[in-house]
Curated annotation (Swiss-Prot):
Record pathway: Polyol metabolism; myo-inositol degradation into acetyl-CoA; acetyl-CoA from myo-inositol: step 2/7
EC number: 4.2.1.44
InterPro entries on file: IolE (IPR023952), IolE/MocC (IPR030823), IolE/XylAMocC-like (IPR050312), Xyl_isomerase-like_sf (IPR036237), Xyl_isomerase-like_TIM-brl (IPR013022)
Enzyme type, top EC level: lyase
Gene3D superfamilies: Divalent-metal-dependent TIM barrel enzymes
Cofactor: glutathione; Co(2+); Mn(2+)
NCBIfam families per record: myo_inos_iolE (TIGR04379)
GO process terms (BP): inositol catabolic process
Lineage of producing organism: Bacteria, Bacillati, Bacillota, Bacilli, Bacillales
HAMAP family: IolE
Protein name: Inosose dehydratase
Catalytic activity: scyllo-inosose = 3D-3,5/4-trihydroxycyclohexane-1,2-dione + H2O
Length: 298
């Protein structure tokens, strides 16, 4: 295994964003998928505006594209596992029908991700009992994912109860590695902890999905000082694609290859498409990948 086992995708949030549906609302599915082909990527993740499987599969087949996965907002602590299991089963059924590989889960109980409050200082924290509930619930959801031929990959995320490296450690320690895997996101790790290698190096054996998200240092520091919310921060440009920010992806990529990572690396950068043209930034990312990561000379 190695470089040839890595699939390169790009997420739809550069074109349209589920956190703010009004952003990029004029960008159609056909436009998005065609841009992805032009930029040289092999697939994408499912956005909130994507259609039912038969319609989506036709559009994918026309462009020889694949689906990597789709986000699922879990509320295991808030609503209990039985309700979540029912919703997650429907989620996995959809993913199976579109040929996905992973089910991306983020626990949204107490999340400030969608609220207009300081995402840098007001993140939630779980009690010991809540941690136990979450970990047991994720094991249950992971078993369901497996029944549909999917890996459950948990997404550590700004503004949630599983954001920091320490919290990722606790989640990994408390869940069964047979059922719960990790989505490793460079941008969320960096903005949370100022470090994106610790999680990667410590939990490489649990990683089944990867997001390459870059960050703009100056904007990050300004947003932190001004106490911006998650949505305010990405509208101001805190995130960008690899090659346009301050993260060194060469070290990350070499680590993944050295450990025989096999699966998707998905470029992800929440930006306002009216400010950051999605195709232009997809091409910036592709150029960086080809010249800095895949070039045999490097």
């Amino acid at each position: 295994m190695g470089k040839q086992d890595i699939l390169w995708g790009i997420a739809p949030i550069g074109w349209r964003n589920d956190d703010m549906p009004e952003i990029g609302a004029g960008n159609t599915l056909q436009h998005l998928l065609s841009d992805i082909v032009v930029a040289g990527f092999q697939g994408t993740e499912v956005g909130g505006f994507f259609p039912e499987p038969s319609v989506l599969n036709k559009e994918l087949a026309l462009r020889n594209l694949r689906i990597a996965g789709k986000w699922f907002s879990s509320f295991i602590i808030q609503d209990g596992i039985e309700k979540m299991a029912e919703q997650f089963t429907e989620h996995c059924d959809y993913l199976q029908k579109v040929g996905a590989d992973v089910a991306i889960v983020s626990e949204q109980t107490y999340s400030v991700q969608g609220l207009d409050i300081d995402v840098f200082k007001e993140k939630p924290h779980f009690s010991d009992e809540e941690w136990d509930t979450l970990c047991q619930g994720l094991n249950r959801l992971g078993k369901i994912a497996g029944e549909y031929g999917l890996d459950l990959t948990f997404h550590h995320h700004l503004g949630t109860g599983v954001q920091t490296a320490e919290e990722v450690d606790r989640l990994m320690d408390g869940t069964d590695p047979r059922y719960v895997h990790l989505l490793y996101d460079t941008g969320h790790a960096y903005i949370s902890d100022g470090d994106y290698m610790t999680i990667l190096n410590k939990h490489m054996d649990r990683i089944r999905h990867v997001h390459f998200k870059d960050a703009r240092f100056d904007i990050m520091e300004r947003c932190r000082q001004e106490g911006k919310s998650f949505r305010q921060s990405f509208l101001q440009g805190i995130f960008t694609v690899p090659g346009d920010g301050c993260i060194d992806f060469t070290e990350v990529y070499r680590t993944l290859v050295r450990h025989d990572y096999s699966g998707w690396i998905v470029i992800e950068a929440e930006q306002d498409p009216a400010v950051a043209n999605p195709l232009e930034y997809a091409l910036i990312a592709r150029k960086y990948i080809d010249s800095e990561l895949l070039d045999p000379a490097n």
